[in-house]
Amino acid sequence: MITAASLLTALAVFIARLCDVCLGTIRHVMIIRGRRLLAFSVAFFEAVIWVYAVSRVIGAVSDPVTSLAFALGFASGTYAGITLEGVFKIGEQVVRVFTREGGPVACTLRDAGFRVTVFDGQGRDGVVNLLFVQVRRRQAGEVARIARNVDPECYMVVDDIRKTYTVGG
């Protein structure tokens, strides 16, 4: 029989699982980005919440509503974690722009405040320029928009950066 107490327990389990799985997704991002201390801190809270959720499910093992809330919280936490990671856009990326209009694209990007390194290359149909632009993840879309405005035929590749090293002064 479903009671108000069992519904409250199920709701608490759902919220706990949503939070701990969401934190787990963020923790994985921090690990990939090399942010050890932040990953450590998130892992601590993730584990505390997980223990709470599991203890509630074990305490109500005969209640299918609580078990369903556990599973639904897991699925919802996965979705929420991915969504949050996309909103926060933590980290840096390198945008590589392949273009025949390297000079104008580089100048426009530099005028917008981006640092651009230009290389010459040989493509299938002749000489191309390869532009490297390192940006915060939230700026990658702006770089792509600027490059496309100058050269609608350009081709871009965007990669996540784990670490960067500065040499010299």
From Swiss-Prot:
Q: Which organism is it from?
A: Oleidesulfovibrio alaskensis (strain ATCC BAA-1058 / DSM 17464 / G20) (Desulfovibrio alaskensis)
Query: What's the protein here called?
Result: UPF0316 protein Dde_2502
Q: Where in the cell is it found?
A: Cell membrane
Record flagged with keyword Transmembrane: yes
- What kind of membrane protein is this, topologically? Multi-pass membrane protein
Q: Into which family does the record put it?
A: Belongs to the UPF0316 family.
Q: Which UniProt keywords apply?
A: Cell membrane, Membrane, Transmembrane, Transmembrane helix
User: Which InterPro entries does the UniProt record give?
Assistant: DUF2179, DUF5698, UPF0316
Q: Lineage in the entry?
A: Bacteria, Pseudomonadati, Thermodesulfobacteriota, Desulfovibrionia, Desulfovibrionales
Which Pfam family is one of this chain's hits?
DUF5698
* Transmembrane annotation, as ranges: 1-21, 38-58, 68-88
Question: Where does this protein chiefly localize?
Answer: membrane
Q: Which GO terms describe its cellular component?
A: plasma membrane
Is the Disulfide bond keyword given for this protein? no
